[in-house]
UniProtKB/Swiss-Prot annotation:
UniProt binding sites for ATP 1: 129, 169, 175-176, 208, 210, 215, 241-243, 284, 298
Gene name for this UniProt entry: carB
Keyword set includes Manganese: yes
Cofactor(s) needed by this chain: Mg(2+); Mn(2+)
Region Allosteric domain: start-end pairs: 930-1065
Segments for region (Carbamoyl phosphate synthetic domain): 547-929
Protein name: Carbamoyl phosphate synthase large chain
Root EC class: ligase
Cofactor: how and how many bound: Binds 4 Mg(2+) or Mn(2+) ions per subunit.
Alphabetical list of SUPFAM superfamilies matching this protein: Carbamoyl phosphate synthetase, large subunit connection domain (SSF48108), Glutathione synthetase ATP-binding domain-like (SSF56059), Methylglyoxal synthase-like (SSF52335), PreATP-grasp domain (SSF52440)
Subunit and interaction comment: Composed of two chains; the small (or glutamine) chain promotes the hydrolysis of glutamine to ammonia, which is used by the large (or ammonia) chain to synthesize carbamoyl phosphate. Tetramer of heterodimers (alpha,beta)4.
Length: 1065
């Protein structure tokens, strides 16, 4: 069927902010889809609230709306633009849910908009647990015994029939939110109550637990002519019971017999046909390891995390082709862009093994529950490609950036045997390392299989790795053994440790003896046809398929897996850097390992190397390609951390020099630079011992901000108010020594201001200045940022610009620079300088119209900013007000304190833009998922230091008709100020206490500021968690509360009686 000519304009719904369960894979899918539709000649309108994405760039769609993804706002856009059709299957769960809402509210019918791709009925059949089960029964496809429940009573009734364990899956939620496995009544009550609350339709599916079965996924595609193919089948190494987003996954499956593979393949194709899906779809199945019994677990009728992985694993662009199927094209008339010859209806074949390992945020959340289950906890993932499973696994392990270069983890090495067994029986994020350790201690594969339910095949492969360690230990310096170890995927660092050599020694020996990797192409057809795509992975074989061209090249280092503190913003900058290199006439080569992102789409760069971002793996590419240089500014801390080692190995770094990077990152050199430039910073010093830290704090006076040197996303930063707290921090948060000094700074309360600038050694361009709503002390990534600044005087703005220009020139910055200032009165202090691309670059680029990464890259390559038409100073302010609001994934992470501080906790961001600050902030808050109620009750419980300030806020809440609830201490303060308030009992008092008030939904907002004491048992912690579990906005900073009040005040008319406020003379 040729493409449809009866539609012209298509609205694409994006997936909104990055949260756990819905990350960069949808930016990749959405970008591909918009470009594919434009390629076919349609007009594309995109709506998405996430400014950090490539897809919200103006060149991706014909019109881009960065507005909240809510029924109200999207309906307005539809009424204004009158699109012919809407494509919701590329916006994750958010896009699907929104399409269902728009249809139910009658908006689509009213405006004559049809849904493209998979039809609404099919979406509902796959997503609604009852309809799905009915369809499976009709098809004769087995599903686990289950019941749909709407209350706890119904849950009890089901469990009486089939017994524990049972799995709870809430309907229409994302990444298994609210779900879990229950093994007893207490867990049932807790998980079912949460699940019902979090499901938008208040229903859960309870099913017999088949935990322990093999979890297999098929990524399938179908068109309107009923052509259907399997793009990729994948096997989860972790058995059923762990969310597939948290599982280690291999493609193609390794342990299925041909009969099992065909059995599950036929089931998947039968299901996608019965559902009538048009586009991409993901089918998850459970296979009994001991028989041919299987169950269908679920179907995602949309592009998903797994389809991004399948696209990158096979090279087959699922989202691009799904978008074209949606407008009527069929698989047998579309050419596969990878080979440029074969049609899209050929199933990809793989002659390599792909391994995906999730990246978890537990380095940021010490207290989080690390147990893995049906609710997703990973923020991102890495992928690696090798010729054997061992090679692929070890490459993926060293891509994770968790401080390991091999299957070796200190905690596992030092663990007692019983602890080790527990860690293997109950899966956590580090189970793989404990399994390796158990094998080293002589535990058998059989025992490990019994403990973990992981297939013996994978355990034997890990044993091969452990056996090779022994061979290496026994044959130091043996070149044949070295060759074999490299073939299994061992890193130079791992071999060096076993041979008591340095990593560079091993590299030198290999180079001398020609034990170097070759690069193979990812071509979708196991080398059967020649391929058009320059997409490579390394392995130790004979023939190299990556041909070096005559054109001078530049290598860009990507930012690796998404984690808190280093998100999609860095991928955005990487992609723009690559595009700018191409524009400048060089060959752009990228090295990265994140399967979710646009940067690892083979059509982004001239050449893509899917490799770990370690000095060794990057050097291999450099040795082959011989580029004119390497750019490290855009890959976040990942790339910056490789700079010193690369330069030591003779690599030319482009842009700001290593010496200048070091002057910005090294505390003492930085202070010296500041004093030479005459720029003030808060008093502070570096400590290399606990005693020294105490002495510095006493000298400059409390409160002080303490943090380790060289960190991203404020890891292990804290504000301490006295000696006791400082000692607690020094003992628990950091290991201080001369190699790892700790910075101790005077903490200044003031406004925080952030600036990004581009410099070329002479000209310094400042696209814009952002003012933070939360005062200094809240991590910049967790603050609400406003452009243009709302409360800064002209004098302060001039000072900020002056200091920025002086710093950029003084530190000889070539490329990007990010500075954070604190403003106290008319004094401006520098808090920190990052000589690289930052988290705010995409937001600022979009709202100011200054293509920052593009200009920075061209400056790095030698073009002067003045030649590009820019001059030193702050760019003219754009009309309108723009706010960047952080988005958190607290509902997914139990046991994590949501209070804001110097350590970053948000996973994503949204934008709000309008003509006034209040309207923009309203949109930003709504887009971030905060429901703003024009009336109701506010619950206040604030620390003593904040009570004075809370009085003014409480009075304003009362003025707009909010009822005030407060705990005793706060209530006393309010009563004394003459404000009417209802006292709520503290946690340990009689019911109804504060937790009951929150649970029963009697408060619309909770304002709770931190009393010191981070322990999970503290009252404040329990109040904040209770608010999150019940979906009530909980503000832990009075600044955020004040901003929200401004929004509420602007929405309500004031009602004052005529006598009030009249002054009698």
């Amino acid at each position: 069927m040729p493409k449809r000519r009866d539609i012209e304009t298509i609205l694409v719904i994006g997936s909104g902010p990055i949260v756990i369960g819905q990350a960069a894979e949808f930016d990749y899918a959405g970008t591909q889809a918009c470009l594919a539709l434009k390629e076919e000649g349609y007009k594309v309108i995109l709506v998405n609230s996430n400014p950090a994405t490539i897809m919200t760039d103006t060149e991706i769609a014909d019109k881009v709306y960065m507005e909240p993804l809510t029924l109200d706002f999207v309906a307005r856009i539809i009424r204004k633009e009158r699109p012919d059709a809407i494509l919701p299957t590329l916006g994750g769960q958010t896009g699907l849910n929104l399409a269902v809402e728009l249809a139910k509210a009658g908006v689509l019918e009213e405006c004559g908009v049809e849904i493209l791709g998979t039809k609404l009925e099919a979406i509902e059949k796959a997503e609604d647990r009852e309809q799905f089960r009915a369809l499976m029964n009709e098809l004769g496809e087995p599903v686990p015994e289950s019941a749909i429940i709407h209350s706890l009573e119904e849950a009890y009734a089901f469990v009486e029939q089939i017994g524990y364990p049972v799995i709870v899956r809430p309907a229409f939620t994302l990444g298994g939110t609210g779900g879990g496995i229950c093994t007893n009544e207490e867990e049932l009550v807790e998980i079912v109550s949460t699940g019902l609350k979090l499901s938008p339709v208040h229903q859960c599916l309870l099913e017999r637990s088949i935990a322990g079965y093999k979890e297999i996924e098929y990524e399938v595609m179908r068109d309107a002519n009923d052509n259907a193919i399997v793009v990729c089948n994948m096997e989860n190494i972790d058995p059923v019971g762990i969310h597939t987003g948290d599982s280690i996954v291999v493609a193609p499956s390794q342990t299925l017999s041909d009969r099992e593979y065909q059995l599950l393949r036929n089931a998947s194709l039968k299901i996608i046909r019965a559902l009538g899906i048009e586009g991409g779809c993901n089918v998850q199945l459970a296979l009994d390891p001991d028989s041919f019994r299987y169950y269908v677990i679920e179907v995602n009728p949309r592009v998903s995390r797994s389809s991004a992985l399948a696209s990158k694993a096979t090279g087959y662009p699922i989202a691009k082709l799904a978008a074209k199927i949606a407008v009527g094209l069929t698989l047998d008339e579309m050419i596969n862009p990878v080979t440029g010859k074969t049609y899209a209806c050929f199933e990809p074949a793989l002659d390599y093994v792909v391994t995906k390992i999730p990246r978890f945020p537990f380095d940021k959340f010490e207290s989080a529950n690390r147990r893995l289950g049906t609710q997703m906890k990973a923020t991102g993932e890495v992928m690696a490609i090798g010729r054997t499973f061992e090679e692929s696994l070890l490459k993926a392990v060293r891509s994770l950036e968790i401080g390991v270069h091999h299957l070796e983890l200190n905690e596992a090495k030092t663990a007692a045997d019983d602890v080790m067994e527990k860690r293997i029986r109950k899966a956590g994020d580090e189970r793989l390392f404990y399994i390796a350790e158990a094998l080293r201690r002589g535990v058998t594969v059989e025992t490990l299989h019994e403990w973990s339910q992981i297939d013996r095949f994978f355990l034997h492969k890990i044993q091969n790795i452990i056996e090779m360690e022994t061979v290496l230990k026994n044959h130091p310096g043996d070149l044949d053994v070295l060759k074999k170890a490299k073939g299994l995927g061992f890193s130079d660092a791992a071999i060096a440790a076993l041979w008591n050599k340095t990593e560079r020694d091993i590299y030198a020996v290999r180079r001398q003896r020609g034990i170097m990797p070759v690069y193979k192409m990812v071509d979708t057809c196991a080398a059967e046809f020649t391929s058009e795509t320059p997409y490579y992975y390394s392995t130790y074989e004979e023939e190299n398929e990556s041909i070096v061209t005559e054109k001078p090249s530049v290598i860009v280092l990507g930012s690796g897996p998404i984690r808190i503190g280093q998100g999609i913003e860095f991928d955005y900058a990487t992609v723009h850097c690559v595009w700018a290199i191409k524009q400048a006439g060089y060959e752009a080569i990228i090295i990265n390992n994140n399967p979710e992102t646009v940067s690892t789409d083979f059509s982004t760069s001239d050449k893509l190397y899917f490799e770990p971002l370690t000095a060794e793996d990057v050097m291999h590419v450099i040795d082959l390609e011989q580029p004119i240089g390497v750019i490290v500014q855009f890959g976040g801390q990942t790339a910056i951390n490789l700079a010193a080692e690369l330069e030591a190995r003779g690599v030319r770094l482009l842009g700001t020099t290593l010496e200048d990077l070091d002057r910005a990152e090294d505390r003492d050199k930085f202070e010296q630079a500041l004093s030479e430039l005459g720029i003030p910073k808060p008093a502070g010093k570096t400590a290399v011992s606990v005693e020294e830290a105490v002495a510095i704090a006493e000298e400059i006076g409390y409160p002080v901000l303490v943090r380790p040197s060289y960190v991203l996303g404020g890891r292990a930063m804290e504000i301490v108010y006295n000696r006791g707290e400082l000692l607690h921090y020094m003992e628990h948060a950091v290991r201080v020594n001369p190699q790892h000094p700790v910075l101790v700074d005077r903490y200044i309360t003031g406004k925080e201001v952030e600036v990004d600038a581009i410099a070329d050694g002479e000209t310094v361009v400042i696209p814009g200045i952002m003012e933070h709503i939360e005062r200094a002390g809240v991590h910049s990534g967790d603050s609400i940022a406003v452009y243009p600044p709302q409360t800064l005087s002209a004098e302060v703005i001039d000072k900020i610009a002056d200091y920025t220009i002086r710093l950029a020139r003084g530190l000889h910055i070539v490329g990007l620079l990010n500075i954070q200032f604190v403003v106290s009165g008319s004094d401006v202090y520098v808090l920190e300088v990052n000589p690289r691309s930052s988290r705010t670059v995409p937001f600022l680029s979009k709202i100011t119209g200054v293509p920052m990464a593009n200009l920075a890259t061209k400056a790095i390559l030698g073009t002067k900013l003045a030649e590009m038409g820019y001059e030193t100073g702050v760019c003219p302010v754009r009309p309108g007000v723009y706010v960047k609001v952080p988005v958190f994934s607290f509902a997914k992470l139990r046991n994590v304190d949501i209070s804001l501080g110097p350590e970053m906790k948000s996973t994503g961001e949204v934008i709000g833009k309008d003509v006034t600050f209040e309207k923009a902030l309203y949109k930003g808050l709504v887009a971030s998922g905060i429901h703003i109620q024009p009336h109701g009750a506010v619950l206040l419980t604030v620390a003593d230091k904040d009570k004075e300030e809370a009085v003014e806020l409480a009075r304003r809440f009362a003025d707009i008709g909010y009822q005030l609830l407060a705990t005793n201490g706060t209530a006393e303060t309010l009563k004394a100020a003459g404000i009417p308030v209802t006292v709520v009992n503290k946690i340990h008092s009689a019911s109804p206490n504060i937790l009951d008030v929150i649970r029963q939904g009697k408060a619309q907002v909770v304002i709770n500021t931190l009393t010191k004491g981070k322990q999970p048992e503290s009252d404040g912690f329990r109040i904040r968690r209770e608010a999150v579990e019940n979906g009530i906005p909980c503000l832990t900073s009075l600044d955020t509360a004040r901003a929200m009040l401004q929004v509420l005040e602007s929405m309500t008319f004031s009602t004052t009686a005529m006598t009030e406020g009249l002054v009698r003379s």
